[in-house]
């Protein structure tokens, strides 16, 4: 969770509303002062820093979860990053450094977290990650992030196959354009919001509540027959 406008927070609110017990992670102390009050507002006492590029940091997170809970029922992955300066211009000009960094944080982190969380889902469970239409179509100002999201969607299918025998489902939610911290990094975001709202069948953009509702379905027994899928929540 980054702040109260993040997709992860919308999901957390929806899950808490259904009685889920939650743990929160954040990236660095800069975000801690925003996340701790949010976690407290839904009764969560587990709030930890997590650096997905640091195995030791993730070890600490999952050691704490194992000690406090003993098991997990679900995982929500809502992490992505690419150099903002390289989201514009030609994808062909993306540097090797930025490509690998983008793939590591935006894609591989889900596989790493899924493996760790799966070990704690002893009675089955569910996992959800967040993707975007730029994974399936060329979108302006998305570049390496689109490639990383495409790899993330493929990861969902492979992970669903890996964990299916253990009763663990793995899916992705693909929200439409949203006014989030991550969304603001995309060039021309305001125009995208406006055009999508004008042209979507429902004539509006999806909300955090909409995404949260989809997550509740996928992470609960309501979605017990759904795995390996990308669920669009974008007003059509």
Where are each of the predicted segments found?
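A conserved structural motif in NAD(P)-dependent oxidoreductases
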Residues: 200-211, 222
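Rossmann-fold cofactor-recognition segment
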Residues: 39-56
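Short, small/polar-rich loop/turn modules that mediate ligand/substrate recognition or access, typified
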Residues: 164, 169, 226-228
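Catalytic loop of short-chain dehydrogenase/reductase
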Residues: 1-7, 80-111, 115, 119, ...
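Canonical Rossmann dinucleotide-binding motif of NAD(H)/NADP(H)-dependent dehydrogenases/reductases
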Residues: 1-23
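Conserved glycine-rich Rossmann-like NAD(P)H-binding loop of the short-chain dehydrogenase/reductase
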Residues: 19-36
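Short-chain dehydrogenase/reductase
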Residues: 224-236
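Short, flexible catalytic-loop segment of classical short-chain dehydrogenase/reductase
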Residues: 170, 174-185
């Amino acid at each position: 969770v980054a702040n109260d406008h993040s997709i992860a927070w919308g999901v957390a609110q929806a899950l808490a509303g259904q009685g889920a017990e939650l743990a929160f992670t954040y990236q660095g102390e800069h975000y801690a002062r925003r996340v701790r009050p949010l976690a407290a507002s839904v009764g969560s006492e587990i709030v930890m820093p997590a650096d997905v590029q640091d195995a030791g940091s993730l070890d600490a997170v999952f050691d704490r979860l194992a000690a406090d809970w003993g098991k997990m029922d679900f995982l929500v992955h809502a992490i992505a990053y690419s150099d903002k300066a390289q989201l514009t211009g030609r994808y062909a000009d993306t540097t090797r450094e930025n490509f690998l960094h983008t793939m590591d944080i935006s894609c591989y982190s889900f596989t790493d977290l899924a493996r760790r969380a799966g070990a704690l889902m002893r009675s089955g469970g569910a996992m959800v990650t967040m993707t975007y239409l730029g994974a399936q179509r060329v979108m302006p100002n998305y570049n390496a992030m689109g490639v990383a999201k495409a790899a993330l969607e493929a990861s969902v299918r492979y992970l669903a196959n890996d964990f299916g025998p253990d009763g663990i489902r793995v899916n992705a939610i693909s929200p439409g354009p949203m006014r989030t911290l991550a969304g603001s990094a995309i060039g021309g975001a305001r125009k995208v919001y406006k055009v999508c709202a004008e042209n979507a069948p429902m004539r509006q953009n999806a909300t955090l509540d909409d995404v949260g509702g989809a997550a509740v379905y996928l992470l609960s027994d309501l979605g017990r027959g759904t795995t390996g899928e990308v669920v669009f929540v974008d007003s059509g």
